[in-house]
Amino acid sequence: MTLAAASVLAASTATAQTAAPPPPTFTAGDGWMAGGFVAATLLAMPFDERLARWMQQPAQQNDAAMKNTATVFRNLADPGTVVIGGGLYIAGRLTHDRTMTDVGLHSSEAIVAASVAGFVIKSAAGRARPRVDIANPHDYKFGRGLNSNDYESFPSGHALAAFALASAVTAEAGYHWADKQTLIGALTYGGATLSALSRPYNNAHWLSDVVLGAGIGTLAGRLVVRWQHTHPDNWVDRTFLGMSVAPAPGGGVAVAFHATR
């Protein structure tokens, strides 16, 4: 009987020590989503010039409501997304709110990941912005985006940042506030959409630029949050979620890193 009990205990211990592998970060659903955004980008291209010309007509450019809305949501995307992500992280550290810290850190990571991908693509594509020549949405030249901001049109950095934040915050809501995820998603994605549309209004991007940017940002947010939550022992979380931020005696804040396992 003792031998049997020992065998059961040994088997239980071995089972406990054999952790189940984490689920895949990139799923079939993500593949379909990526393909959908690529298709949407291609479908948007025939309408690039038409929308650009419509947006620049006096009726739209002199509309105070459209102009003010575009300004607000353009700034919400840049620098707003960085301020929001970083602000949530710092506020979470100061108030010792793990959830707020988590959301701020992971949304900031998503913005960085999307921005890096966007920089690589726009630098290589070298697409001219509509303000360069509104009659030529097909003006691409490999590598030209490295030389001038006028040729960094494809994809939109504002759109990808706004959608990365929206996607990450919505994904985090599924872990922390599942009953409010739909509402949070509607608000954040709604704001991201208006941020994206501000770019054609400002004659800075074509329609297809913002569609691709939205796709990159959305995927970045989903993948970053999923990876972080299925790999909780990753070095980013160990370092930055273990960091403490507190008011310094002489003013300002004191920062200390406490890497955890």
Q: For each predicted feature, which ranges?
A:
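Flexible, solvent-exposed coil segments and beta strand-coil junctions
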Residues: 17, 61-65
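Alpha-helical transmembrane segments of multi-pass membrane proteins
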Residues: 40-52
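Interfacial/capping segments of alpha-helical transmembrane domains
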Residues: 50-61
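Interfacial helix-start motif at the membrane-water boundary
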Residues: 64-86
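Interfacial helix-capping/hinge residues at the ends of transmembrane alpha-helices
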Residues: 86-88, 118
